[in-house]
């Protein structure tokens, strides 16, 4: 009698498994259709990717050359500033902020690894998280005081995200996540997947020293993958170290603005806010 019950139990289990498999086969295609293609992200107005232009350090050429160039091209960019450098061209920076460009936080002292001799007095190896917190808050206060705007995104100086040494080393990414809408890196090798990326670690890819065909290839790759490309530069000019070339921008901006290229061209803040809204 027990063996008969066991056989009935086994047969019933097999039947249930078969029914589950059949339901999965029937429902599978419909479920996949409901989910949509893997990694799909809906950019505004049917765009296929997003691109942001950003510039670091509050260098003089940004207000002396960059402001007029971007205004002529009808483009808005994000500028990550160090307050003491803003003070040297304050009228120009006030005009830039009034023009609708985003002003972001780039710290008070631009701390990087002390392996750079010029950063030895503000070496990340000698920082604590509390010191970094105080510096970032103070930089935001000074930006408000100087330019009357609130910096809601941040760019890591030198793209470096640590404080301390050895076993005491800590990441200050969590601090940036607490204080800012987004934190941008530097010298990264890929654009951002909007469905996966960490807002406190937005990748930033270089555009200094590059010509238009080089940058266009990066934009096209981001478009094919549905990504957010944040380009990062420093000086505005025609040649020189850490210089984003004027000729390149004169071709890149119209390319990004052309509806046929299906790119959403916006500031770091606006793209970051949109992605956050989509992820809720």
Task: Indicate residue ranges for each PLM-predicted region.
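N-terminal secretory signal peptides that target proteins for export/translocation
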Residues: 1-11
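Boundary at the C-terminal end of the N-terminal hydrophobic targeting segment
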Residues: 32-34
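C-terminal domain-boundary segment and adjacent tail
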Residues: 36-45, 77, 85-88, 180-196, ...
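Short, well-structured secondary-structure segments
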Residues: 52-54, 67-88, 94-107, 152-156, ...
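Second-shell loop/turn segments in exported
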Residues: 52-54, 121-130, 239-242
């Amino acid at each position: 009698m027990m063996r008969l019950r066991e056989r009935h139990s086994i047969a019933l289990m097999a039947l249930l498994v078969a029914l589950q498999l059949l339901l999965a086969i029937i429902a599978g295609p419909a479920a996949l259709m409901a989910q949509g293609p893997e990694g799909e992200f809906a950019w505004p107005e049917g765009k296929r990717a997003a691109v942001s232009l950003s510039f670091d350090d509050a260098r003089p050429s940004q207000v002396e050359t960059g402001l007029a160039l971007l205004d002529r091209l009808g483009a808005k960019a994000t500028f990550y500033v160090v307050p003491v450098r803003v003070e040297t061209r304050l009228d120009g920076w006030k005009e830039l902020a009034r023009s609708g460009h985003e002003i972001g936080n780039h710290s008070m002292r631009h701390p990087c690894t002390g392996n750079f001799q010029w950063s030895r007095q503000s070496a990340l190896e000698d920082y604590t998280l509390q010191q970094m917190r105080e510096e970032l808050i103070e930089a935001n206060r000074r930006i408000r005081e100087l330019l009357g705007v609130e910096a809601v995104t941040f760019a890591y100086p030198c793209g470096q995200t640590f404080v301390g040494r050895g076993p005491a080393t800590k990441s200050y990414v969590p601090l940036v996540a607490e204080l800012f809408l987004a934190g941008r890196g530097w010298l990264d090798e890929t654009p951002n997947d909007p469905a996966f990326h960490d807002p406190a670690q937005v990748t930033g890819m270089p555009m200094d020293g590059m010509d238009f065909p080089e940058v266009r290839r990066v934009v096209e790759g981001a478009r094919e993958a549905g990504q957010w490309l944040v380009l990062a530069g420093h000086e505005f000019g025609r040649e020189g170290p850490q210089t984003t070339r004027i000729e390149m921008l004169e071709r890149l901006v119209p390319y990004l603005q052309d509806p046929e290229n299906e790119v959403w061209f916006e500031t770091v803040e606006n793209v970051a806010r949109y992605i956050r809204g989509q992820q809720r």
